[in-house]
């Protein structure tokens, strides 16, 4: 679960970190009032969506009049912002953040993630702020400095100082950086973050550190115990199909291909996507129905896949270990009858009750293509998606 920038900065402020004075608004009139309340003659207005690249897409602007504040707000509210991190439809803008203007002398990067290789929270800092950190990591990895947090003792001031030295900060800035570092680490622990980024963490003209942006991702497995984070949840920023799938305990991720995939098990699902790609197809989704799939969940999974208008064919690939193939077959039949499928369906069943499952499908009277192997299934579904 992700947070909006204004929500992240609200948390930063609660932990005593330096952020700009700002207000999240949902009308042009409220935006003008926010600018008046902030004061000054320049403001930054930012469209609030769960995606990076807003500036290049026109979703962030420096303005110097109340008319511009109102015009920007009027222009973006209710519209979708498309960036390099969104799909072609973009994400809806329901809030605009109006902030005071900050003079920038230098831009840094500070972030933290849960690193699976070390099984620790790892902080990363770089002098290359304001750009995509992935690009920095790929092209100049030596410019990214790391601090690994021991979960038994937590973040320590000396770790902050080590990073600050590598960033070339002066003594006053080192003290400020230490406060920011320790505050972020505590916040990361308190709210079960999975990702945290301040990009950029700027040095102002006065030489002070300032959190100019904020990106936070919450561990979805921990949201149930984070009541405050639940209040920050914005369902409008989620893919409708993904949100619907989550209610049925289905692991679904929308992609941009035309071959719908329904598989049991994450590993098999990824392997299925790979083999579809290998044979010239493009998966429209990742969907894992899980080992404890029921007939109802399978039917719902089928409906979710078919709700994507880009899907031209569906591949059902089931290995019956815990789940029974005949039950999956009944779910497929139920879904096809309910939804009214008008695209080819290729089914590959192996494992527990596979023969019975194939028999159920064969006797259903439905136009379902039976595959004899995984390779055969991939070849058949790619051909079907191409209309061959």
Swiss-Prot record:
It is an enzyme of class 6 (ligase). GO terms for molecular function: ATP binding; magnesium ion binding; succinate-CoA ligase (ADP-forming) activity; succinate-CoA ligase (GDP-forming) activity. GO terms for cellular component: cytosol; succinate-CoA ligase complex. Its EC number is 6.2.1.5. The keyword Ligase applies. One of its GO terms (biological process) is succinyl-CoA metabolic process. Substrate binds at residues 264, 321-323. Keywords: ATP-binding, Ligase, Magnesium, Metal-binding, Nucleotide-binding, Tricarboxylic acid cycle. Binds 1 Mg(2+) ion per subunit. Residues 9-244 form the ATP-grasp domain. It holds the Pfam family ATP-grasp_2. It catalyses: succinate + ATP + CoA = succinyl-CoA + ADP + phosphate; GTP + succinate + CoA = succinyl-CoA + GDP + phosphate. Mg(2+) binds at residues 199, 213. ATP binds at residues 46, 53-55, 99, 102, 107. SUPFAM superfamilies: Glutathione synthetase ATP-binding domain-like, Succinyl-CoA synthetase domains. Its cofactor is Mg(2+). Pathway: Carbohydrate metabolism; tricarboxylic acid cycle; succinate from succinyl-CoA (ligase route): step 1/1. Succinyl-CoA synthetase functions in the citric acid cycle (TCA), coupling the hydrolysis of succinyl-CoA to the synthesis of either ATP or GTP and thus represents the only step of substrate-level phosphorylation in the TCA. The beta subunit provides nucleotide specificity of the enzyme and binds the substrate succinate, while the binding sites for coenzyme A and phosphate are found in the alpha subunit. Heterotetramer of two alpha and two beta subunits. Belongs to the succinate/malate CoA ligase beta subunit family. PANTHER family: SUCCINATE--COA LIGASE [GDP-FORMING] SUBUNIT BETA, MITOCHONDRIAL, SUCCINYL-COA SYNTHETASE BETA CHAIN. This is Succinate--CoA ligase [ADP-forming] subunit beta. The lineage of its organism: Bacteria, Pseudomonadati, Pseudomonadota, Gammaproteobacteria, Oceanospirillales. The gene is sucC.
């Amino acid at each position: 679960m992700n947070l909006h920038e204004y929500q992240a900065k609200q948390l930063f402020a609660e932990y005593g970190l330096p952020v700009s004075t700002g207000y999240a608004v949902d009308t042009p009139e409220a935006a003008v009032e926010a600018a008046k309340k902030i004061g000054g003659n320049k403001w930054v207005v930012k469209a609030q969506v769960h995606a990076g690249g807003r500036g290049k897409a026109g979703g962030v602007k420096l303005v110097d009049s109340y008319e511009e504040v109102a015009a920007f707000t009027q222009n973006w509210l209710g519209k979708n912002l498309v960036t390099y991190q969104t799909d072609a439809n973009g994400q809806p803008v329901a809030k605009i953040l109006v902030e005071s203007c900050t003079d920038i002398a230098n831009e840094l990067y500070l972030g933290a993630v849960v690193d699976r290789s070390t099984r620790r929270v790892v902080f990363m800092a770089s002098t290359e702020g304001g750009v995509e950190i992935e690009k920095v990591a790929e092209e100049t990895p030596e410019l990214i400095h790391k601090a690994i947090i021991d979960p038994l003792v937590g973040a320590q001031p000396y770790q902050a100082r080590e990073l600050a030295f590598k960033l070339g900060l002066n003594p006053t800035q080192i003290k400020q950086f230490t406060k920011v570092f320790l505050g972020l680490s505590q916040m990361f622990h308190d709210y079960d973050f999975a990702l945290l980024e301040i990009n950029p963490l700027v040095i102002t003209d006065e030489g002070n550190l300032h959190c100019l942006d904020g990106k936070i991702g919450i561990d979805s497995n921990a949201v149930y115990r984070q009541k405050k984070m639940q209040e920050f949840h914005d369902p409008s920023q989620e893919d409708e199909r993904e949100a619907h799938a989550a209610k049925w305990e289905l692991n679904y991720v929308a992609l941009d291909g035309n071959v719908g995939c329904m598989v049991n098990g994450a590993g098999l699902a990824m392997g299925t996507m790979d083999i579809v790609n290998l044979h010239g197809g493009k998966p429209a989704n990742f969907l894992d129905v899980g080992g404890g799939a029921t007939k109802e969940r399978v039917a719902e999974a089928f409906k979710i896949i078919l709700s994507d208008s880009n899907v031209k064919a569906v591949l059902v690939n089931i290995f019956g270990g815990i789940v029974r193939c005949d039950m999956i077959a009944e779910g497929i039949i139920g879904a096809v009858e309910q939804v009214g499928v008008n695209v080819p369906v290729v089914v590959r069943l192996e494992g527990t009750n596979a023969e019975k499952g194939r028999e159920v499908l064969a006797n259903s009277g439905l136009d379902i293509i039976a595959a004899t192997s995984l390779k055969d299934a991939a070849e058949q579904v790619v051909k079907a998606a191409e209309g061959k």
